[in-house]
Regions:
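Contiguous, well-folded functional domains in the mature portion of proteins
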Residues: 2-268
Length: 268
C-alpha cells in the first residue's frame, strides 16, 4: 500500500515541490539583494521557503494513503487562492500541512503478544471500569473496559490490541457526541470488532466517531487474522476507541495517562 507506484509518485512530487519552494524563496531573496528588483516581499520569501521545508519533510514522513486525496484538494485550492491573494494561499497551505500531518502513520515498536494487551490508539485514557459488553454483542459477562480518547493532534490509525481472528464485525450508525463523554459509547456512530485470541478469549474493540470525526474506516474483513499491533482502521478528526477484556485482566494504566498505539501496554 505505502510502496505502491502512486504513493511513490506522490512522495516524489512532495519532495520536488518542497525543494522548488525552498529554491524559489532563496533565489528571490538573492535577486532582491543583488539587483534591487523585488519579486516577493521579505515575508513572502520566508513563507515560500518555510512551505518548501515543511513539504520536503512530509515527503519523508509516512502518511496514510487516505490523506492524499485531501492533500490534492487542499493544495489545488491553496494554489488558486495564492494566485489571487498570497496570504490566503499561505493559510490554505498551512491547512494542507495539517491535513497531511493528521494522516501521519509512523512505524511502531510492537511488543510480543505475551506481554499483554497493547493500546489500539494514540491518546489519553479516559475510562477504566468493569461493565457489560456493548449491547450489540451477545455476552452477559462482566468485562474490563478501557477507553482511549484521541484528539485531532493524535495519530488516528488504529492497531489490534492482541493477535487474533475476527469473529464478528458490527457497524452501528449513530450520533456525533463529544467522544470523551461516557454516553458516546452507546449513542455515537461506531464499528465493533470481536477478536478471539490464542487463549480462546473474546477481546472487543470499538471504534467510536467523535464530535468532529464523521467517518470510521475499517481495513479488515470478517474472519481475517490480525497480528498484534497490525493496523485495522482509522477514524477521521478526533474520536475514541473502547477495549473490552475478560474481567481477569488487570489494567496497567491510569486515568489521564497518555498511551501510544501499538506500543503501550494497557492491561495484562
Amino acid at each position: 500500500m505505502y510502496n505502491s507506484f502512486p504513493m511513490r509518485i506522490l512522495r516524489k512530487l512532495l519532495m520536488f515541490f518542497g525543494l522548488l519552494f525552498v529554491a524559489a524563496g532563496a533565489i528571490s531573496s538573492l535577486i532582491g539583494e543583488l539587483t534591487g528588483i523585488v519579486t516577493f516581499s521579505g515575508l513572502q520569501n520566508v513563507s515560500v521557503s518555510c512551505m518548501g521545508v515543511v513539504t520536503f519533510w512530509l515527503s519523508l514522513e509516512r502518511v496514510h494513503p487516505e490523506g492524499y486525496k485531501f492533500f490534492l484538494i487542499f493544495i489545488l485550492l491553496s494554489s488558486l487562492l495564492g494566485f489571487f491573494y498570497f496570504p490566503l494561499g499561505v493559510l490554505g497551505f498551512l491547512l494542507t500541512i495539517f491535513v497531511l500531518w493528521f494522516f501521519r502513520d509512523p512505524e511502531r515498536m510492537i511488543p510480543s503478544s505475551e506481554t499483554g494487551i497493547i493500546s489500539p490508539a494514540d491518546g489519553v485514557i479516559c475510562k477504566i471500569e468493569k461493565t457489560l459488553a456493548p449491547k450489540e454483542v451477545k455476552s452477559s459477562e462482566e468485562l474490563l473496559k478501557i477507553s482511549v480518547f484521541m484528539n485531532v493532534f493524535n495519530v488516528h490509525v488504529n492497531r489490534a490490541p492482541v493477535a487474533g481472528n475476527i469473529k464478528e464485525i458490527i457497524y452501528v450508525p449513530g450520533k456525533f457526541i463529544n467522544a470523551s463523554l461516557d454516553k458516546a459509547s452507546e449513542h455515537n456512530e461506531r464499528n465493533i470488532l470481536v477478536l478471539e485470541n490464542n487463549k480462546n478469549e473474546e477481546i472487543i474493540v470499538v471504534q467510536i466517531a467523535g464530535l468532529i470525526a464523521r467517518r470510521i474506516l475499517s481495513f479488515v474483513n470478517l474472519f481475517d487474522s490480525l497480528k498484534i499491533g497490525e493496523r485495522f482502521g482509522l477514524i477521521r478528526f478526533g474520536s475514541r476507541v473502547d477495549v473490552y477484556l475478560p474481567s481477569s485482566y488487570v489494567p496497567k494504566v491510569k486515568l489521564g495517562q497518555k498511551v501510544t498505539a501499538g506500543e503501550s501496554i494497557i492491561a495484562s
